Regions:
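Catalytic core of soluble alpha/beta enzymes
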Residues: 101-115, 134, 152-172
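Residue-level detector of anion-binding/catalytic polar loops
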Residues: 149
Length: 172
């Protein structure tokens, strides 16, 4: 289908924990289609979701870093970003559906907030905004070093076309 539609490049949307086996296999095919990952990095700042602890555990395992503090977390993220870069990634996408406020925070406070999050599994909404701000700034710097594009979807409206949703399901 891709060849018939004259697709030259296919960018997939992948979580930070993604495996690039499929990308490698696709690049070995003789169809002359470039397959690159793009990073969907929502999980990096999804502190209030029940799956965040699992995300941190999997990140630790895949990066080879035991995550005990914010510095460990950021180093583990950077290791994974290197793998994305090696696989040809040039785009990172962050969904901020609930909106976003940037609140500058110093590294010491961000470290304390992350430590609290690791210990208790909870931080307040104000603390969440601060930690998200700090980590998004870190991510932006990482992307800039790699010459990537960073997309922020702030307050995006989802599921707005009821006719398409009826015909196509959740993709509509």
């Amino acid at each position: 289908i891709l060849k018939r539609c004259r697709v030259e490049m296919l960018c997939t949307s992948d979580d930070l924990l993604a495996d690039f086996t499929w990308h490698r296999q696709a690049s070995l095919q003789p169809q002359n289609i470039i397959v690159k990952p793009s990073l969907r990095a929502d999980s990096v700042i999804s502190f209030t979701t029940p799956s965040f602890r699992d995300f941190v555990s999997q990140l630790a395992e895949l990066s080879g870093i035991k995550i005990k503090c914010l510095e460990d977390y950021l180093n583990a993220i950077d290791i994974r970003l290197n793998l994305f870069s090696d696989a040809g990634c040039e785009y990172a996408d962050h969904s901020l559906d609930a909106g976003f406020r940037f609140v500058p925070v110093l590294s010491g406070e961000a470290s304390s907030l992350f430590g609290k999050l690791l210990q208790t599994g909870e931080i307040s909404s104000v603390e969440t905004v601060k930690l998200q701000s700090y980590i998004l700034l870190f991510m932006g710097r990482c992307y800039a070093r790699r010459n990537w594009n960073m997309q922020l979807h702030i307050g995006a409206k989802r599921d707005t076309n009821t006719l398409l949703r009826t015909r196509l399901g959740p993709a509509g």
